[in-house]
Amino acid sequence: MSRKMLVTCALPYANGAIHLGHMLEHIQADIWVRFQRMRGNEIYFVCADDAHGTPIMLNAAKQGITPEQLIEKAKTDHVADFKGFNISFDNYHSTHSEENREITTEMYKKLRANGFIKSRVISQLFDPEKQMFLPDRFVKGTCPKCKAEDQYGDNCEVCASTYSPMDLINPRSAVSGATPIVKESEHFFFDLPSFEGMLKEWTRSGSLQSEIANKMQEWFESGLQQWDISRDAPYFGFPIPDAENKFFYVWLDAPIGYMASFKNLCDRTGLNFDEFWKKDSETELYHFIGKDIVYFHSLFWPAMLDGCELRKPTNVFAHGYVTVDGVKMSKSRGTFIQASTYLKHIDPECLRYYYAAKLNERIEDLDLSLEDFVQRVNSDIVNKLVNLASRNASFIAKRFEGKLADKLEDEALFAEFIAQSEQIAAHYENREFNKAIRLIMDLCDKANKYVDDKAPWVIAKQEGCDAQLQAVCSMGIELFRVLMSYLKPVLPQLAERAEAFLQTELTWDNIQQPLLGQNVAPFKSLFSRLEKKQIDAVIEETKALFAAQNKAEDKKGKQKVENTENTAVEPIAAEITIDDFAKLDLRVAKVISCEAVPESNKLLKFQLDLGDHQRQVLSGIKAAYNNPEELVGRFVIMVANLAPRKMKFGVSEGMILSAGTGGADLFLLSADEGIRPGMQVK
């Protein structure tokens, strides 16, 4: 019996380009959706741009355009990127739409009527220059716990403490640089604790990934809190009904964007929207998301739906991040690759296949090893799969005018291939794509071994063996057809070219039906080898792209420095004695390695040589040094006798000295030539 399903991907933020990290999720979901279509299920695949929030408002102002213009350009670019990677959305919409405004307003009113919206007056930091309340991430200052400078308003990335923005020492607006003032404002809250019982039951249903269920249990033990769903003007978003100058927080209307995109599709095609969203719906609803937004999709979103008497997701499928060559994607190394840059140089099916070969049902990071990428694509797709067709098709075309044999040369081998159909289907269903690919490639090896053992090139030279030659080559093409059917969800373009060659549609239902006695088209090249020079071209273009951006930012920074040269410096600190100073053991250290801490916006991780030993130091100077690997080999000055400090991202065994006001305005101290690691500063 056919299943009815609705599938979504997390909404890309309309404030930047799509990159290969985004593509992991969209390729994963698209493979799953295409498989379900091949199985005959009624499935709809929707997404949208997440188009609201303070960052979009500020970025638009910075560019001298309206937020509407900014998000329209982003949507055009995003749609082009997804199309380039053959992501088969039935609809791609925007959260800044009439459908989303209507549904968001309706759901808010329903939650309010059901008693799940609370209000209270809160105190917030306010930028007197920009006349706007400042979100936590738009306030910076000194950490109240460890006194680290240039920390965000909600947590310290040096000591991992959390706090209120008003606890910051010397806070400043990240928008204008002004010193914020405290103002009161009425805010609206979603009463999440009221849904704890429902959420616990949903967690125990067994349908969620174990990692998500375990994480939810931690959140339950910590205690659920009411969720602030309002923001004060100015803000780019939807206004809250009956509340002057109040807007819905972007994370309230973002998941509702799933519904809005589907509603837009329903209005255009006549689909029944309520059938998929009513509380007793018998359809299935799946969300593919990254591990960084599990909190919103496993707590707030199902609670909101339940509070509005709507159905909850059947499941939420989370995935990990993409690393390149074992480390976080890097702009300076050229591995923070935008989708549009990739598409200029490399076939999108290469990445689809590589991701599929490594994706499983767990929340694990996936490493894009560039050397392995080239080797696997060429080995599996070109040398094994496509070569299987080409080495047999030439004989069928030249000797038999494209006509296949009337019977299978090896029925047992064909039956073995068909017998794997349900196991491969189960792997696809369970999102264990790596297992599906492994099994398909095992079959591909068997198919090529069959051809090697039969050696049609030898048979072709023997008198009176035409029937045997036709039978062997037809068998090879038949096995290629089965393999391409199994790979169609992963490689839709290659499958389309294979269908043109085979003169038949590849479906799951006809896998077991051989093309006996039928004609195939003249063989044309199905797939090109992936060359290292293509990878190099992507890397170099990515480096150039971000180098140009850094140059523009550096130019602005220099102008800013020139404009502030005459500003007052910080006052001299209180006097100390020579004995106080003598307590510090300052040493010269050589940078052995330096890399960004992936989870932190501030920290660089240094490995330092002090002559007789090495130290690891975490330093909050990321904003000042965009290319940390360029620091390797430099000499720095460090406080060597500072007690080791266990931080959120590891242990720091000292402090590197720098000068400046903080943020991008920091400069490492260095020394003259001739110094050696371990020398004491006196």
UniProtKB/Swiss-Prot annotation:
Do you know which Pfam families this protein is assigned to?
A: Anticodon_3, tRNA-synt_1g, tRNA_bind
Q: Give TM regions.
A: none
What is one term from the GO cellular component aspect held by the record?
cytosol
Enzyme Commission code(s) on record: 6.1.1.10
Q: Which GO terms describe its molecular function?
A: ATP binding; metal ion binding; methionine-tRNA ligase activity; tRNA binding
Q: Main subcellular localization, coarse class?
A: cytoplasm
Subunit structure, interactors included: Homodimer.
Q: What is the name of the protein in this document?
A: Methionine--tRNA ligase
Q: Which organism is it from?
A: Actinobacillus pleuropneumoniae serotype 7 (strain AP76)
- Source taxonomy: Bacteria, Pseudomonadati, Pseudomonadota, Gammaproteobacteria, Pasteurellales
Name of the gene = metG
